[in-house]
Amino acid sequence: MGQKVHPLGFRVGITKKHQSQWFARFQKYAYSQSVFEDHMLRTTLVNLFSNLEKESALATKQSKNRGATQPKAPKITQIKIERGLIPYEIGIQIHSNDCLSITKAIDNIKVSKDLVTNLQKTRKYLFKAGTQLKNASMQVSDNLNVAEGENSTMLKTKTSASGTSVLKKRTFKIQTQKPTKGKFVFKGKRKQKKKLSKAVFMRLKNIKRRFKKRQTIKKRYLNIISKGLLIRKKGNLIIRNVKIKRKNKTARLTSRKSQPTLRSGSNLRDNLAPVKSKMQRFNNRMSKKFANLFLTKLNKQFLVRLKAIMKFWHNQNVTKAPLGYNKKWSLAKSYALINNLKAKYLAKDILSLGSLRVQKLRKLISILEKKSLVKMETLRKDFITFGTLSKTRAFGYYQMITFLKQLKELVTKIKKQTIANVTTKQELCCYNKLALNKTKIQNLIRAKSKQTKSITQKVVNNFVKLVDDNQAMANESRKIKWISYLKDLVNKHRTENIFYYLATIATARKDLNALKRYTKQHANFLFGVNVENAKENPNALLQRVTKTLTQYSKNPLVNNDFENAEGLTKLQTAFLTQIESQRKMYKANLALTPKISIKFFSVKTTNLLEKASTVADSIVDALEKRKAFRGVIKKAKEDLMLRSRVTRVKGVKIQVAGRLNGAEIARSEWVRAGRVPLQTLRANIDYAYRTANTIYGIIGVKVWIFKGYSKI
């Protein structure tokens, strides 16, 4: 039914090593030691509660005889152990129907000290015996090695004298040749070649083959280069370049044997044609270059002249309109356009009017820019053709540009006005909101101060009640006793299995040293003391530190003005609390003492009967009383399904395995009712496993209860 998981955190049932994966970071978070510790805690708690149940059963038997009312025995549905990443904190949750009666189990705790001492003695004895055995075995092995070494040296000396020893690598045996008639004959005169392994031999063979291949390729390319043939590949095309040495194509005299003859490489006209084409190309290219250079120089001159004319018209006060003056581009025109816009959109809001103005003016600006560019192009062409600029046309261009500039300035002004209006409105809104928020915050502060006062009063009242009420005091003392007992138990367990906790002790030491360094570095902020200056007067430093610590340790319930007494700020107190808590934690880790918290959760009777653990326990009780297994299983199933109308039980599966009804061959039987989807992840399934100890052996009981789908 799904993948099995080992309690230490890795997958089980996989034979291949590469497929097994760890489900937890084993070394980092100390997963193994926590699992081992949790198992120990759970077993101790179960034993405690089982003793309590036995006592309650005896009490019920006695009450039956007397004819008194039968008290209900307390049942534990679940024992949950919670942990953080640090092994310092352990949270234990106990879910049961009667929490008060379960707390009485602590009164029955009896620790046998003799048993612990005997165990320690036996452990020491076994450890000593083991070490002695190891030492003895080591001595024997050393003696054997020495004897073997001496034998080998003796044999070597003998063979060197005779010269007949041949060592074999694999068998490690020494063979000696027998002497024949007083003459020594050496068997191995020739040096035997070292036999290579198959893999090495194949590798060397491949290397030789590749080397030969490279040499052949090199030779082939050298031949091709010597002939003047080279092949190139461009995509799918293969191009062959033929390089031939140039011969003198002009007519020259050649002598065959003795008669001189005039010989030409080819026809003279054919030879001169490509030369002419090359000359034409060169001339065209040069003329283009010259034209480009000339145009760039002219353009530069045009820009210089145009700038000079623009400056002339800008600096000169134009009293009379010169030639080329146009009424279209006058300054009054722009203001008239804006006045018309105002008259049109007076009925609308200021924001909408501003946006409409800006849109219209932007369109106008874009059109004017295009026209100005066209005019500039005409001026440039005239300058290239005639070599000068006409003043009338230049003045028209200047008028257009100035009009454009003023229009752009006007648009920016309108934008600024609209933004200013919007910001003022927003500021007013924000101011009103802030005023409202201030009042709300003040009310909240008052309410919080009242709450804190009421909480402090409640705490004080609770303490007073505890002192007065004897039962409450007894419960509190019982809880403290329980926690101290569990602390001692965990401490013993950790000291016995200290090899699991060496890493945690080392980290705790490192953290403590780091905390000390931090406090020294920030001593000025925390205690108002310079460590370097205080080395001369250590008594003053001690007094100052003790003052601040005593002031910090004052109870806020008694002293409300403890922060302002010696200038201790809230930040300082927060830092001091944090440092103190960390220091305590690291010291506890070094001493291997945990911080244990116990919480009891009461479970309703209806919910208790739905739990898989209670159903499994009831089946175990029935089987141990020698009842027929089929009847027990069916009854449990039917009871659960009858309650399904009221409760949220939607399916049940019960499995029993072992020597059922005392049968010789063990088998497994199961019963199911409703739906029990064991493969779906969303399914909320309550599972429990118990073992029934019968006369015929152990019977395993498994219960699955399906309680609907959970939201992921």
UniProtKB/Swiss-Prot annotation:
Superkingdom assignment: Eukaryota
Its protein name is: Small ribosomal subunit protein uS3c
Q: Which UniProt keywords apply?
A: Chloroplast, Plastid, Ribonucleoprotein, Ribosomal protein
Quaternary structure (record): Part of the 30S ribosomal subunit.
InterPro entries (alphabetical): KH_sf_prok-type, Ribosomal_S3_C_sf, Ribosomal_uS3_bac-typ, Ribosomal_uS3_C, Ribosomal_uS3_CS
Region S3-like 2nd part: list its residue ranges: 581-712
Q: Which biological processes are named by the entry's GO terms?
A: translation
- Family in the record: Belongs to the universal ribosomal protein uS3 family.
Q: Which NCBIfam families match?
A: rpsC_bact
Listed GO cellular component terms? chloroplast; cytosolic small ribosomal subunit
Instruction: Please give the residue ranges the record annotates as the region S3-like 1st part.
Output: 1-118
Q: What else is known?
A: The large insertion sequence is present in the protein as found in ribosomes.
The subcellular location is: Plastid, Chloroplast
SUPFAM superfamilies, alphabetized: Prokaryotic type KH domain (KH-domain type II), Ribosomal protein S3 C-terminal domain
Region annotated Intervening sequence (IVS) sits at 119-580
Q: What is its main location?
A: plastid
Question: Is this entry keyworded Plastid?
Answer: yes
* GO MF annotation list: RNA binding; structural constituent of ribosome
> Would the keyword Ribosomal protein turn up in this protein's UniProt record?
yes
